[in-house]
């Protein structure tokens, strides 16, 4: 009886014991509750007496069941045969399928043992049920009956369907026939009698399914029923039939060598002439299948060997039966048997693996280290190398997958050599260093223990691979993923801390490189490792192939918070004066990063206040020995930088720079091969006054010349956009009168190289400083002189350059700033009179009394110095 509540149109009710559905009609409800009520069938008859109710007799519920499907499925259990009959009489359709494609006839055939099946099936067939209808899997009523003839269905049902012309060789979606279904289930749900019946009615004994398998193959695969095998063979089953993978019946039977009666089945097939050396598409024989799948049952293996199976036959990949057994078996017994029968223990397959190789890398899957021990005891080559690596390395490779640390220990205990390199030049230890990184944190402890085990068994931490790496440099290459414990372990076992790779990078250099752009967490880890390496004696001055030391790498970093590392490196005697291949010193790197930050920081002022219109340049006065300008150098003080959110980073970078500048071994005026100092470099690339002032405050010499003869002033006038940088250099006693190698002084060099605006500012500040022209041949050159000829010299330069069309605009800008009464031609009367005045004021009598000036004396009507004095005073207001 179905245990259900009262009928509810929206309720959920059972279609049969294990399947519930919504959408039940009142008729469906009356059917499943028929035997709950003594008048159950009468209620159904009464309900169907109403023509209105009959109209909905074929209505489906949500699972696709009709009232007839439910009645047939539960006939004899919840309802009666009489109910099935009245439904058919009232017009219930026999071929309506539920959502799984099952018709009432299929239900009846499957369940005929419990539902008055013979009578129900006859009744359904009488009312036009399609005997060959298929469900969604392609199963027919005959297939269901044949599969279950010894359980839910019956032999009689199968015969009834066959007598009513059911198609005996129809196939389901997988290509299985009724005979195949019966053979698959003969041990449990079907019977030999059913198979004999199907064969009697003409079932095709050698029909094949979608995989090319026959009924005999299915029998060998699933039943292991000796009587069935003999029946099929006696009825003409093809013993040498081959499925689409090339498997024969003997291979299939050998594959299930651990099953009941498997030995007898194999023996029957062999005795009936099955080819014991047949091969499938992988060239595997029945013996190979028996070895691969037998596990602890060796009977079939022994039988095949006794029947003459070749123990050394190889498959497509050159695997032998021993290799397959060592790879897949969970028992040592098949391996023992094969070895006792003379199997070659050191045969290798196409990948170079012997039986021990494969036993080791699969030791975790089978949880059996006894196979490994047996193969070693029987003389397997423990140091065999496959196409790439040794057995020990392969075992370590599969740690956490197919192998385990116990297997590694067994190998090491039996003298496996951890120092044999693989084809890439890496030993087992070097391989594990990479695996330690690759596997990540989840397997870190496991890999750490394996590395320690290898070191305990004399693995050489200083073995050098083809990339010139030892274990420490190999790990350090992945410095962002390394923790300090593994580094400590290698150091404890004597790894060479200063070994370098092909790029001349030591572990210290590699970790410093990682600090350049690492995140906070990684940076913290790398810092600790750097400190450890220094404590353990790492050479702080190793130079890599780019010419960088640890200090220069750190100084080039974008990370502002590396003061402690810089301090630590310097404390360990890092050389701050090295030059890399880019001709940079650590100081140059550090000041350039500081300058870069200042330039790109939005909150740093881009223009420091300056007085570019000043008529004086205090640097010239200072250099000449005159009194300092009233404008103090402190106007350039870094304290003027307004406080902002970037101030902490500015302070960090400034601190790093000052630390290096103040270190006792730092040569602030150190020159590279091109003669460039940190100050020259900064003046050449920067518009920021702060880093330049830091250098000058710490003793940078502004008058050092590079290989071109250029000083900081030369660099500044050419590259900077700010007159303040030039003025700052002058305030720190930069000499504006130093010549370049090509004979150019500062002003003429500025005129040639600097921007128009800068040249105007430079020239304006030189007007009141003593200069003169060297010669008529080099009119644009201005040099220091005791003579007060600066205005004339400037005019001469302007007059000369005004002839150059491209520079005429500069002349136009400067000329209004010169006294308007001075004419352009220096040989004119006014120019000569002005020169005479200046010579007199300087007291240069020798230069006044010349033949050239006699014409002027005559013009002025003077005969002595007193008259000349009066005349000069008189004409001062007119020239």
From Swiss-Prot:
| Entry keyword annotation includes tRNA processing | no
**Pfam families given for it?**
Ank_2 (PF12796)
Ordered alphabetically, the record's keywords are: ANK repeat, Repeat
Q: Does the entry feature the keyword Nucleotide-binding, yes or no?
A: no
Superkingdom to which the source organism belongs: Viruses
Spell out the PROSITE patterns in the cross-references: ANK_REP_REGION, ANK_REPEAT
Give residue ranges of the ANK repeats. Answer: 22-62, 63-96, 100-133, 137-170, 174-207, 211-241, 245-278, 282-313, 317-347, 351-384, 387-420, 424-463, 470-499, 506-542, 546-578, 674-704, 708-738
Q: What is this protein called in UniProt?
A: Putative ankyrin repeat protein L88
């Amino acid at each position: 009886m179905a245990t259900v509540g009262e009928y509810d149109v929206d309720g959920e009710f059972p279609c049969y014991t294990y399947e519930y559905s919504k959408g039940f009609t009142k008729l469906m409800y009356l059917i499943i509750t028929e035997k709950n009520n003594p008048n159950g069938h009468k209620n159904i008859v009464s309900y169907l007496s109403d023509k209105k109710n009959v109209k909905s007799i074929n209505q489906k519920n949500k699972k696709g069941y009709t009232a007839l499907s439910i009645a047939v499925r539960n006939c004899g259990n919840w309802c009666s045969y009489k109910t099935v009959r009245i439904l058919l009489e009232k017009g219930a359709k026999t071929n309506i399928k539920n959502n799984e494609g099952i018709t009432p006839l299929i239900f009846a055939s499957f369940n005929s043992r419990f539902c008055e099946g013979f009578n129900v099936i006859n009744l359904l067939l009488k009312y036009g049920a399609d005997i060959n209808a298929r469900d969604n899997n392609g199963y027919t009523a005959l297939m269901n009956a044949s599969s279950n003839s010894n359980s839910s269905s019956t032999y009689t049902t199968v015969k009834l369907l066959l007598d009513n012309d059911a198609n005996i060789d129809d196939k389901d979606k997988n290509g299985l026939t009724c005979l195949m279904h019966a053979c698959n289930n003969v041990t449990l749900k079907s019977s030999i009698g059913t198979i004999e019946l199907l064969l009697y009615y003409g079932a095709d004994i050698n029909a094949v399914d979608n995989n090319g398998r026959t009924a005999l193959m299915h029998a060998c695969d699933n039943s292991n029923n000796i009587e069935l095998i003999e029946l099929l063979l006696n009825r003409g089953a093809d013993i040498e039939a081959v499925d689409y993978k090339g498997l024969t019946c003997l291979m299939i039977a050998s594959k299930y060598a651990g099953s009941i009666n498997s030995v007898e089945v194999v023996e029957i097939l062999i005795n009936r002439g099955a080819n014991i050396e047949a091969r499938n598409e992988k060239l595997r024989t029945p013996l190979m299948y028996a070895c691969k799948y037998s596990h602890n049952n060796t009977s079939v293996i022994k039988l095949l060997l006794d029947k003459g199976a070749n123990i050394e036959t190889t498959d497509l990949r050159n695997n032998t039966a021993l290799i397959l057994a060592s790879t897949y078996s969970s028992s040592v017994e098949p391996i023992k048997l094969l070895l006792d029968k003379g199997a070659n223990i050191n045969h290798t397959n196409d990948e170079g693996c012997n039986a021990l190789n494969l036993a080791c890398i699969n030791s975790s899957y089978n949880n059996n280290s006894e196979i490994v021990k047996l193969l070693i005891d029987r003389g397997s080559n423990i140091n065999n190398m496959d196409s790439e690596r040794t057995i020990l390395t392969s075992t370590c490779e599969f740690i956490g997958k197919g192998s385990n640390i116990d297997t590694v220990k067994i190998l090491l205990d039996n003298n496996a050599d951890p120092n044999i390199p693989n084809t890439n030049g890496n030993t087992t230890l070097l391989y594990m260093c990479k695996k330690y990184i690759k596997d990540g944190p989840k397997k870190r402890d496991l890999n750490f223990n394996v590395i320690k085990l290898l070191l305990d068994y004399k693995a050489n931490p200083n073995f050098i691979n083809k990339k010139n790496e030892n274990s420490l440099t190999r790990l350090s290459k992945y410095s962002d993923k390394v923790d300090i414990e593994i580094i400590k372990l290698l150091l404890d076992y004597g790894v060479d801390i200063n070994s370098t790779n092909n790029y001349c990078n030591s572990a210290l250099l590699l970790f410093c490189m990682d600090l350049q752009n690492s995140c906070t967490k990684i940076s913290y880890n790398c810092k600790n490792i750097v400190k450890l390496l220094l404590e353990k004696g790492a050479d702080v001055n190793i130079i890599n192939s780019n010419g960088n030391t640890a200090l220069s790498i750190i100084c080039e970093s974008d990370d502002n918070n590396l003061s402690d590392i810089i301090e630590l490196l310097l404390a360990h005697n890092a050389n701050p004066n090295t030059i890399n291949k880019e001709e940079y010193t650590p100081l140059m790197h550090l000041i350039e990063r500081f300058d870069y930050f200042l330039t790109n920081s939005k909150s740093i002022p881009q223009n420091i206040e300056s007085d570019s219109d000043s008529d004086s340049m205090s640097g010239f006065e200072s250099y000449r020995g005159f009194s300092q300008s009233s404008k103090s150098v402190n106007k350039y003080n870094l304290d003027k930088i307004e406080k902002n959110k970037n101030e902490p980073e500015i302070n960090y970078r400034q601190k790093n720079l000052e630390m290096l500048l103040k270190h006792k071994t730092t040569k602030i005026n150190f020159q590279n091969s091109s003669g460039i100092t940190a100050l020259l470099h900064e003046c050449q690339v920067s518009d920021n006054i702060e880093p330049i002032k830091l250098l000058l405050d710490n003793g940078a010499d502004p008058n050092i010349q590079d290989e071109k003869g250029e000083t900081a002033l030369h660099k500044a006038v050419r590259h900077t956009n700010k007159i303040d940088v030039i003025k700052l250099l002058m305030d720190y006693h930069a000499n504006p009168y130093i010549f370049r190698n090509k004979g150019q002084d500062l002003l003429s060099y500025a005129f040639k190289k600097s921007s128009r605006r800068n040249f105007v500012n430079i020239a304006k500040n030189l007007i009141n400083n003593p200069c003169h022209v060297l010669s008529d041949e080099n009119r644009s050159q201005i040099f220091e002189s005791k003579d007060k000829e600066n205005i004339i010299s400037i005019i001469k330069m302007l007059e000369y350059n005004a002839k150059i069309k491209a520079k005429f605009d500069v002349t136009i800008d400067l000329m209004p700033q010169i006294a308007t009464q001075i004419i352009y031609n220096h040989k004119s009367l006014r120019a000569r009179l002005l020169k005479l005045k200046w010579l007199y004021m300087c007291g240069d009598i020798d230069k006044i009394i010349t033949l050239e000036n006699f014409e002027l004396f005559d013009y002025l009507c003077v005969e002595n110095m007193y008259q000349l004095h009066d005349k000069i005073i008189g004409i001062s207001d007119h020239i």
